[in-house]
Amino acid sequence: MSTELVEDEAQFYCKAQKYWKNVPATVDGMLGGYGHISNIDLNGSKKFLQRFLRQEGSNKTGNMYALDCGAGIGRITKRLLLPLFKKVDMVDVTDEFLSKAKSYLGEEGSRVGNYFCCGLQEFSPEPNRYDVIWIQWVIGHLTDEHLVDFLKRCSLGLRPNGIIVIKDNVTQDVSIMDDVDSSICRDIDLVRKLIKQAGLSLLAVERQENFPDEIYHVFSFAMR
């Protein structure tokens, strides 16, 4: 379990919060200096998501409302979710990022319903509200127990045929703690195990292509 890497839970969360307080409210800041990969990332995400939005028949995922978790300034909200959904809610632990989002999103930001300033370990989506809950590059800031609990709460937040998507760095063997931003990069088998513990079933798993060789492999997991 990766939580064994967390010696002091309160410190784990506090250190991460302090780290993000000092990160510039820019796309490059959101991506740790890798702003140049944003388009590749968003194109891969759109392709992954549209397989569910374009499904034929009764299993098709709706396009009414999405939730962006760990939303930052709204990079994903602006370029992925607002073009595909009628409304979007954003949740992030850093108030300065959400404040910046209101100008960064421009006119389309009028379709953002709520800006929730909250850590995901304390956040509960409104039941039966969202067609898609998008969780990208943020699960490393949750302990295993809090991640499982959060996914359970997300499951309750889904509308019929809704899906949860996790997109994040994974390792192939052991989980690794990053002491700089106080986050855990989990091994892919552990991510699958925690999803199962939350009572969710995987619908699709896909590796993001065309990312720089020096960064961790990034996988998308769709579930409900």
UniProtKB/Swiss-Prot annotation:
Binding positions (S-adenosyl-L-methionine): G70, R75, D92, V93, T94, L120, Q121, Q136
UniProt cross-references to Pfam families, sorted A to Z: Methyltransf_PK (PF05891)
GO MF: histone methyltransferase activity; N-terminal protein N-methyltransferase activity; protein methyltransferase activity
EC number from the UniProt entry: 2.1.1.244
Keywords in alphabetical order: Methyltransferase, Nucleus, S-adenosyl-L-methionine, Transferase
Subcellular location field: Nucleus
GO biological process per UniProt: chromosome segregation; N-terminal peptidyl-glycine methylation; N-terminal peptidyl-proline dimethylation; N-terminal peptidyl-serine dimethylation; N-terminal peptidyl-serine trimethylation; spindle organization
Entry's Gene Ontology cellular component terms: nucleus
Record bears the keyword Nucleus: yes
Reaction it catalyzes: N-terminal L-alanyl-L-prolyl-L-lysyl-[protein] + 3 S-adenosyl-L-methionine = N-terminal N,N,N-trimethyl-L-alanyl-L-prolyl-L-lysyl-[protein] + 3 S-adenosyl-L-homocysteine + 3 H(+); N-terminal L-seryl-L-prolyl-L-lysyl-[protein] + 3 S-adenosyl-L-methionine = N-terminal N,N,N-trimethyl-L-seryl-L-prolyl-L-lysyl-[protein] + 3 S-adenosyl-L-homocysteine + 3 H(+); N-terminal L-prolyl-L-prolyl-L-lysyl-[protein] + 2 S-adenosyl-L-methionine = N-terminal N,N-dimethyl-L-prolyl-L-prolyl-L-lysyl-[protein] + 2 S-adenosyl-L-homocysteine + 2 H(+)
InterPro entries xref list: MeTrfase_NTM1, SAM-dependent_MTases_sf
Role of this protein: Distributive alpha-N-methyltransferase that methylates the N-terminus of target proteins containing the N-terminal motif [Ala/Gly/Pro/Ser]-Pro-Lys when the initiator Met is cleaved. Specifically catalyzes mono-, di- or tri-methylation of the exposed alpha-amino group of the Ala, Gly or Ser residue in the [Ala/Gly/Ser]-Pro-Lys motif and mono- or di-methylation of Pro in the Pro-Pro-Lys motif. Required during mitosis for normal bipolar spindle formation and chromosome segregation via its action on target proteins.
Family membership noted in the UniProt record: Belongs to the methyltransferase superfamily. NTM1 family.
Name assigned to this protein: N-terminal Xaa-Pro-Lys N-methyltransferase 1
